[in-house]
Amino acid sequence: MKKVLFAVLAVSAVFALAGCKEKKNVVVNSKADLENLSIGCQAGTTGEIYIQEDLPNAKCNSFKNVIDASLSLKNGAIDAIIIDELPAKEVCKNNSDLTILDLDLVTDVYAIAVKKGNTKLLNSINKTIADMKTDGRYESLVADFMPADGKIKIPAIEAKSGNGKIIMGTNAAFPPFEYVEGSKIVGFDAAMAQYIANDYGKTLEISDMAFDGLIAALQSGSIDFIAAGMTATEERRQNVDFSEPYYESKQVVIVRK
């Protein structure tokens, strides 16, 4: 399936070649080999935290999204990327010169964030997640967005008319959970959010922004909930309330072949 964001990546790579630095040969076989490397990550993510806390001798390079990090890796500006497994697979599927290493770094769980104290919305979201897992809709979304053959199918989900709108905040550069297809933001989280909006009796609106600005937007009331492959960390729980987990992921390493 053609994805606009990775088409942008491919085009950008062509223009970036002129300014790329010499790529050093990097051999990574274990966590220890990551020390002293220049490692990219998405700002505000588990990968960034891992580099800062578990790899004190590595240089942490934080990017707005995985697309920018991938360009820097391809051009030799950084040596590796630490990112969630499924987005890493999408990157490597579209870039044959990159590959994934699973070094058992850390696992985490994704959950939906709401403003602290918004128990009405939180309870509704938890019920929707539970119902989806019971009636088969959750498994259907997994099959659509995480197929074994890699051929993603975007399901048609009826958007029920609602009384007012509910705004989902996300960073639409994290496939297959959220990404841009044509002019629309789609993905596993976006599809799940449509079910959440339907059950809550609201019309869904999706707001795309920088990942590390999502919690501030939630606290200010600019958005109603966050669905962005966000890990439910204890630090974040000080500022938001999280739903029950809906997906378990792990951090992997992307390197040049």
Task: Describe each PLM feature range.
Residues 31-44, 166-170:
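Short loop->beta-strand "edge-of-pocket" segments that line small-molecule binding or catalytic clefts
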Residues 85, 89-126, 152-155, 172, ...:
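Periplasmic-binding protein-like
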Residues 15-19:
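C-terminal motif of bacterial Sec signal peptides marking the signal peptidase cleavage site
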Residues 24-27, 43-46, 61-75, 108, ...:
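Short helix-initiation/N-cap motifs at beta->coil->alpha
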